[in-house]
């Protein structure tokens, strides 16, 4: 699988984004979904065209004049049988273009323990929900939890907030979910109807979405199963995973579904976590995400929460274009004693963590939640379980302040997540150039619901966001078999221009590189303030020797708040004893952040907090720069 940016950067909804295309050595699979654009006419014309050719139709909300045609009578993997339908559409004089959607794989991120134990619980599971309130149950570490109790005591339970679960459907008849189900905001994109109920299978494989929904919105005090993180929130089902192949049009439609009703979208799926896949959103989905953060929630931006991945130490979530997107909040997981789960992937794009299981045989160490057909379970797990917990915490924050933008939520995540008692046996905790503590696996720490709602209540919207191409290295350079290739790039971060970026949020290194064995590549980038981000770690199962990375946007959040001006360093090398060859053809530095200090006007309640530290840092920097400007002015006059 090959991924990269074409036409390098595309503008949509006032934002720059990388248009990613993918090529595979395998024969493409063609589906019964078509992207159709008409020469003229509106939705009524599209319905007429669709009906004449035997298609159903939906208008795409994120793009003017584009329609989703679907033909339920077509075999999903037969190019020959569907070709004449495509040709008939193309020959219709009203149709400008008709693109048949290719199918690709998307996997649920649920970890299935080989020692699964059947447990039928009739009693409420609240005392077993250690990730909500950890008192040491299931051999856990007391106090290592989401601190939801503090948020609940302050009166925040998710009222007025809707979370969309993009998955295999939800059991909206479940007695622990029914009272919080938002039917108006729900849809089934697998069957094209408004009833996203899971398809029955003997092995309950399609329980994934129902379990995620219960973590967020299971009702409280009804003697059924457990309690959702935001137990007064509404949950919407967006069924989109349960078909033989995923398509760009289904993903884009799901991500852009009802953006004025749905506040938070939770995704516990992504490309295959096999340690050798490089994949991400296609063009329509990228466009839908850009549209979501720019226009969703009345212009405040849809909040996308993504599970970082279940590939373990064999994989790297920077090879997943969903988890490593600037527009998503990528969430990893810890187990109940603070260690990493066996399936956790590490990467520089992860923003924070919540909880799941993964190492322990204790049957109560899993995540307790709702299950299919009115049942309960103690066995939900994987980063699949982590993302909905985060969505629930964000729902509590939104209730505290409905004016929060998608960027505000990311800033709050950075500032209120805590190291707590998290322990990473491989990667140390470090501080970036402005003193923010981060970890390559856990991001900025575990979410703290109490701290987040308290800060959210007084939060002032962060300054406008700008995008700067900080520079580019285009000369091909060979990567030595031993040692490292070191490249440097000095940037002024567009200073003096209208898109100057002074305070960093996200940084992307767009890299084109080939190697005799892609999985042995290691790429690090160091900022001018000395923060080292591991952009790519070794993936021992990735034996690609042909496609490499083609304009792939590696992303880091570790330089959050730093000054981008100065010299950036990129190091590329091989891990392992086998001789290797490689060459880097391009490195483009993309800087995203604000010109004005984001925290100077924020209200500080806790003078030991990261906000207090960051605000002090900003004030000192602003003072230093003001003094420097004054000195230059005085010297200029003399």
UniProtKB/Swiss-Prot annotation:
Annotated catalysed reactions: Release of protein hormones and neuropeptides from their precursors, generally by hydrolysis of -Lys-Arg-|- bonds
Active site, per annotation: 167, 208, 384
Record flagged with keyword Nucleus: no
GO biological process annotation, one example: peptide hormone processing
Superkingdom field: Eukaryota
Sugar-modified residues: 375, 514, 524
Domain annotation Peptidase S8: ranges: 129-453
Disulfide bonds: 225-376, 317-347, 468-494
Propeptide stretch(es), residue numbers: 26-109
Gene Ontology cellular component list: extracellular space; membrane; neuron projection; transport vesicle
Assigned EC number: 3.4.21.94
Residue stretches making up the P/Homo B domain: 461-597
Subcellular location: Cytoplasmic vesicle, Secretory vesicle; Secreted
Keywords (A to Z) from UniProt: Cleavage on pair of basic residues, Cytoplasmic vesicle, Disulfide bond, Glycoprotein, Hydrolase, Protease, Secreted, Serine protease, Signal, Zymogen
InterPro entries (alphabetical): Galactose-bd-like_sf, Kexin/furin, P_dom, Peptidase_S8/S53_dom, Peptidase_S8/S53_dom_sf, Peptidase_S8_Asp-AS, Peptidase_S8_His-AS, Peptidase_S8_Ser-AS
GO molecular function: serine-type endopeptidase activity
First and last residue of the signal peptide: 1-25
Family: Belongs to the peptidase S8 family. Furin subfamily.
Function: Serine endopeptidase which is involved in the processing of hormone and other protein precursors at sites comprised of pairs of basic amino acid residues. Responsible for the release of glucagon from proglucagon in pancreatic A cells.
Protein name: Neuroendocrine convertase 2
Phylogenetic classification of the source organism: Eukaryota, Metazoa, Chordata, Craniata, Vertebrata
């Amino acid at each position: 699988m090959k991924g990269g940016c074409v036409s390098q950067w595309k503008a949509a909804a006032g934002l720059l984004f990388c248009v990613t295309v993918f090529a595979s050595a395998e024969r493409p699979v063609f589906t019964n979904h078509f992207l159709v654009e008409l020469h003229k006419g509106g939705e009524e014309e599209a319905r007429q065209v669709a009906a004449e050719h035997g298609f159903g139709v939906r208008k795409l909300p994120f793009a003017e004049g584009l329609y989703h045609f679907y033909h339920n009578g077509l075999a999903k993997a037969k190019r020959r049988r569907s070709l004449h339908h495509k040709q008939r559409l193309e020959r219709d004089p009203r149709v400008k273009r008709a693109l048949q959607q290719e199918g690709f794989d998307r996997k649920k991120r649920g970890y299935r323990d080989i020692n699964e134990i059947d447990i039928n619980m009739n009693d409420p599971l609240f005392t077993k929900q250690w990730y909500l309130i950890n008192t040491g149950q299931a051999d856990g570490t007391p106090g290592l939890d989401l601190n939801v109790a503090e948020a609940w005591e302050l009166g925040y339970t998710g009222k007025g907030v809707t979370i969309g679960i993009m998955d295999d459907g939800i059991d909206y008849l479940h007695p622990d979910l029914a009272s919080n189900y938002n039917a108006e905001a729900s849809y089934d994109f697998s069957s094209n109807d408004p009833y996203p109920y899971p398809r029955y299978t003997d092995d309950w494989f399609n329980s994934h979405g129902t379990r995620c929904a219960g973590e967020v919105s299971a009702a409280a005090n009804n003697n059924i199963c457990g309690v959702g993180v935001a137990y007064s929130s509404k949950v919407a089902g967006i069924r989109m995973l349960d078909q033989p192949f995923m398509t760009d049009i289904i993903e884009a439609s799901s991500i852009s579904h009802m953006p004025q009703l749905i506040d938070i979208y939770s995704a516990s799926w992504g490309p295959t976590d096999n340690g050798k896949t490089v994949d991400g959103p296609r063009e329509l989905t990228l466009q839908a995400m850009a549209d979501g953060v720019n226009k969703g929630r009345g212009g405040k931006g849809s909040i996308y929460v993504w599970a970082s991945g279940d590939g373990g130490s064999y994989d790297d979530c920077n090879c997943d274009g969903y988890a490593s997107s600037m527009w998503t909040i990528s969430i990893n997981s810890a187990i109940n004693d603070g260690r990493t789960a066996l399936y956790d992937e590490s990467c520089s794009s992860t923003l924070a963590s919540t909880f799941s299981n993964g190492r322990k045989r204790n049957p109560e160490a899993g995540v307790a939640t709702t299950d299919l057909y009115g049942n309960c379970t103690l066995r939900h797990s994987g980063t699949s379980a982590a993302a909905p917990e985060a969505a629930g915490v964000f729902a509590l924050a939104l209730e505290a302040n409905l004016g929060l933008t998608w960027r505000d939520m990311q800033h709050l995540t950075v500032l209120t997540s805590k190291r707590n008692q998290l322990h990473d046996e491989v990667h140390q905790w470090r501080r970036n150039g402005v003193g923010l503590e981060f970890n390559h696996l856990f991001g900025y720490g575990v979410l703290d619901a109490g701290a987040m709602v308290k800060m959210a209540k007084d939060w002032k919207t962060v300054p406008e966001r700008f995008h700067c191409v900080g520079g580019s290295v285009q000369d091909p350079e060979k990567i030595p078999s031993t040692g490292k290739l070191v490249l440097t790039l000095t940037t002024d971060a567009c200073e003096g221009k209208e898109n100057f970026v002074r305070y960093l949020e996200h940084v992307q290194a767009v890299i084109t590189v080939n190697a005799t064995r892609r999985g042995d590549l290691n790429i690090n980038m160091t900022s001018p303030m000395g923060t080292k981000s591991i952009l790519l770690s070794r993936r021992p199962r990735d034996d690609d020797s042909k496609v490499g990375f083609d304009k792939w946007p590696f992303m880091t959040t570790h330089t959050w708040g730093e000054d981008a001006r100065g010299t950036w360093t990129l190091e590329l090398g091989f891990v392992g004893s086998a001789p290797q060859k490689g060459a880097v053809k391009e490195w483009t530095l993309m800087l995203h952040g604000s010109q004005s200090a984001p925290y100077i006007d924020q209200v500080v309640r806790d003078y030991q907090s990261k906000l207090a530290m960051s605000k002090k840092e900003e004030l000192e920097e602003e003072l230093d720069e003001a003094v420097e400007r004054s000195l230059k002015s005085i010297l200029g006059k003399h």
